C-alpha cells in the first residue's frame, strides 16, 4: 500500500487531510477525533486537537529539532571497530545495556535508526557523539511528555520501571580491558 499512488487513493488522502485540518481549526476534542487512542490514553480526554498540535510543535521548536535532526546525520561519526566485530561481541553477549545519559563515547552494538526518516544513524561499531545523545535525550523526554506519540527509534530499548515511567537504553559493546573504550 502506497499513499496517493492512484487517483482514488490520492482523493482519499486529500479528503482525510482536509478533515484533519477542519478538526484542527475547530480544535475538536481528541475523544471525538481519536476515540480509541483516548481510551488507551485518558490524559488526553480534555485536550483539543489544535492544542495538542501546538504543544507538540512548541516542544519541537524549543529543542530546534529540525536543526538537531540534520546535525545528527551530519555530525562526525567515529568508527571504533568493524561492524562484524561489534556483531560478534553482541553475539557473545559482550555488551552492556547503557542508559541514554551515559552513551557519549560508547560503541553501539546495535543499528540505531530513528523513524522518521528511517535512515540508519549509527551502525554497530560506531561511537555515540554528543549530538546523537542530545537527540536521544529529547526523544526520551518527548516520550514522557506525550505518551502515545512516542518517537520510534530502532535500537533504543525501553523498559518500564516500578512505580511508572520508562527508562531507555542502547546495547553497547563492553569496554575492552586493553583497548580504549566500548
Stretches with model-predicted labels:
Residues 2-182:
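Non-catalytic terminal extensions of PLP-dependent enzymes
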Amino acid at each position: 500500500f502506497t499513499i496517493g499512488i492512484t487517483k482514488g487513493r490520492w482523493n482519499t488522502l486529500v479528503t482525510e487531510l482536509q478533515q484533519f485540518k477542519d478538526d484542527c481549526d475547530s480544535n475538536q476534542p481528541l475523544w471525538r477525533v481519536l476515540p480509541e487512542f483516548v481510551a488507551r490514553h485518558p490524559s488526553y480526554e480534555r485536550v483539543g486537537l489544535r492544542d495538542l498540535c501546538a504543544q507538540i510543535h512548541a516542544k519541537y521548536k524549543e529543542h530546534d529539532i529540525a536543526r538537531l535532526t540534520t546535525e545528527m546525520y551530519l555530525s562526525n561519526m567515529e568508527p571504533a571497530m568493524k561492524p562484524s566485530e561489534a556483531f560478534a561481541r553482541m553475539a557473545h553477549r559482550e555488551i552492556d545495556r547503557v542508559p541514554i545519559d551515559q552513551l557519549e563515547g560508547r560503541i553501539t552494538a546495535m543499528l540505531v535508526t530513528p523513524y522518521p526518516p528511517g535512515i540508519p544513524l549509527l551502525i554497530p561499531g560506531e561511537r555515540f557523539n554528543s549530538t546523537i545523545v542530545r537527540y536521544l535525550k529529547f526523544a526520551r523526554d518527548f516520550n514522557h511528555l506525550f505518551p502515545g506519540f512516542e518517537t520510534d527509534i530502532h535500537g533504543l530499548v525501553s523498559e518500564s520501571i516500578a512505580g511508572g515511567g520508562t527508562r531507555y537504553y542502547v546495547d553497547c559493546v563492553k569496554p575492552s580491558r586493553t583497548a580504549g573504550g566500548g
